[in-house]
Amino acid sequence: MALWGGRFTQAADQRFKQFNDSLRFDYRLAEQDIVGSVAWSKALVTVGVLTAEEQAQLEEALNVLLEDVRARPQQILESDAEDIHSWVEGKLIDKVGQLGKKLHTGRSRNDQVATDLKLWCKDTVSELLTANRQLQSVLVETAQNNQDAVMPGYTHLQRAQPVTFAHWCLAYVEMLARDESRLQDALKRLDVSPLGCGALAGTAYEIDREQLAGWLGFASATRNSLDSVSDRDHVLELLSAAAIGMVHLSRFAEDLIFFNTGEAGFVELSDRVTSGSSLMPQKKNPDALELIRGKCGRVQGALTGMMMTLKGLPLAYNKDMQEDKEGLFDALDTWLDCLHMAALVLDGIQVKRPRCQEAAQQGYANATELADYLVAKGVPFREAHHIVGEAVVEAIRQGKPLEDLPLDELQKFSPVIGEDVYPILSLQSCLDKRAAKGGVSPQQVAQAIAFAQARLG
C-alpha cells in the first residue's frame, strides 16, 4: 500500500506506478533505511510519541528485519512497494501491527531518503578509500621491484627522456593520493545529518537533532531544513571525484595497453586479466585494461547527467531528485570495480627490462643531456638547443645514437665538446642528473617510495 493514498480517489495507473516506483534501485538503501528508523524511534521516545517499551519492540523488529535483509536482499525486489521506505514500513507493520504505523510520526520521506543516501555514501566512501589505498600500495610495491628498469619517458607519445618503470608507477601513486584526498574532503561535507528536517520546514517535534545525528554516526546535524532535503552536493562531489579518479585509471590503462603492445613490448600481462580471440589463436588481449578505459565514459556521463538534473530545480524537494541514485550507484560501483581490477593487473605484470632499456637507448632521449653539457661549458641554452638539434639530424642521417658519433664529428657542431661528453650521454647519467625533488634519479625515486610507504603505513 502507498504511504500517501488518503488524498486520492482513483488508483494510480499501472504504467505510472512502474514509471514512478524506485524500489528496483533504491532497495540498495535498505540497511541505511532500517538503521535510520531505529535512530528515529529513539528520538520519538524523547518527545513522548513512543514509550520506551514501544521503542524497544520497534527496534527489535527492525533489527530482525535488518538481519533478514542482509541474509536475503533479493526478497526486496519481489515486492511491488513504491520505494524502500514503503517496503521497510510495510514489513515493520507486518511484524508489530499498529505500532509500526507510529514510526513515521514527524518524519518525511524527504529527510528520510536524504539521510539514507548520505549513510550509503559514507559506507561507500570507506570502501573506495580502502580500494584506493590498496592500489597505491600495489603500485609502490611494483615501483620498489622495478627501480632499475629503465624505459623511455614520452611526450606527444614520442620518446623524450629516460625514466624508470618505478618512476612511472609513482606518478600514478600521486594521482591516486589526490583522489584519496578528494574523497576524504567530500566526506567532511557529507557528514551532516538531515534527519529531523521533515518535508522542508523542519519537524514539529522538539527533537534534539544533534543527538540524533550522533546516534547515526554523523559529525553534526544540518542547519537549514530547506537546504537539507534538497541538497545533493555530496552526490555531485562524489561523482566528480569518481570522474577524476576514473580519468586517472583510464590513463593508467592506456599506458599499460601501449606498453603491452608488440611494438613496445615493455610489459607482459598475466593470463588472469587477458582474453583470447574466437578466430585468431595467437591473440592475448588486454581486456581488463580496455574495460577500465571504456568504463571511464559512463562515469563522466553520470556526473554530467546529475549536473543537468539539479541545475533548474527550485527549493525544496522535487521528484527529479529520485534520479540521483542510479547514476551514483553505477558510477561508484564502476570506480570501485576498476580500482580492484587495476590492482589485479599489476599483481601479475612482468616488466621486460632488456626491452625497456633497448627502447630507452633509442630515439635520442639523451639529447637534453648534451644540451646541458654545452650549457655547463658556457654555451647559452638556446644556442645549445640548436647545436644539439643539428647533431641529432646528423646522427639520424648516419643511423647512429648520439653517443656513437666520433668526437671529431661532434666537434663540428661545437668546439667545446670534449671526451668527457661520452659518460654524460649514458642512460645512467641521464637518470642520475635528475636529482632535484620529484626527479627520476635513483635517490629521488627511493625517497619517493619510502615516503609513500610511510604514508600508506
UniProtKB/Swiss-Prot annotation:
<dbReference type="GO" id="GO:0042450">
    <property type="term" value="P:arginine biosynthetic process via ornithine"/>
</dbReference>
<dbReference type="Pfam" id="PF00206">
    <property type="entry name" value="Lyase_1"/>
</dbReference>
<keyword id="KW-0963">Cytoplasm</keyword>
<dbReference type="InterPro" id="IPR029419">
    <property type="entry name" value="Arg_succ_lyase_C"/>
</dbReference>
<dbReference type="InterPro" id="IPR022761">
    <property type="entry name" value="Fumarate_lyase_N"/>
</dbReference>
<keyword id="KW-0028">Amino-acid biosynthesis</keyword>
<protein>
    <recommendedName>
        <fullName>Argininosuccinate lyase</fullName>
        <ecNumber>4.3.2.1</ecNumber>
    </recommendedName>
</protein>
<dbReference type="GO" id="GO:0004056">
    <property type="term" value="F:argininosuccinate lyase activity"/>
</dbReference>
<dbReference type="InterPro" id="IPR009049">
    <property type="entry name" value="Argininosuccinate_lyase"/>
</dbReference>
<dbReference type="InterPro" id="IPR020557">
    <property type="entry name" value="Fumarate_lyase_CS"/>
</dbReference>
<dbReference type="InterPro" id="IPR024083">
    <property type="entry name" value="Fumarase/histidase_N"/>
</dbReference>
<keyword id="KW-0456">Lyase</keyword>
<comment type="similarity">
    <text>Belongs to the lyase 1 family. Argininosuccinate lyase subfamily.</text>
</comment>
<dbReference type="GO" id="GO:0006526">
    <property type="term" value="P:L-arginine biosynthetic process"/>
</dbReference>
<comment type="pathway">
    <text>Amino-acid biosynthesis; L-arginine biosynthesis; L-arginine from L-ornithine and carbamoyl phosphate: step 3/3.</text>
</comment>
<dbReference type="InterPro" id="IPR000362">
    <property type="entry name" value="Fumarate_lyase_fam"/>
</dbReference>
<dbReference type="Pfam" id="PF14698">
    <property type="entry name" value="ASL_C2"/>
</dbReference>
<dbReference type="InterPro" id="IPR008948">
    <property type="entry name" value="L-Aspartase-like"/>
</dbReference>
<dbReference type="GO" id="GO:0005829">
    <property type="term" value="C:cytosol"/>
</dbReference>
<keyword id="KW-0055">Arginine biosynthesis</keyword>
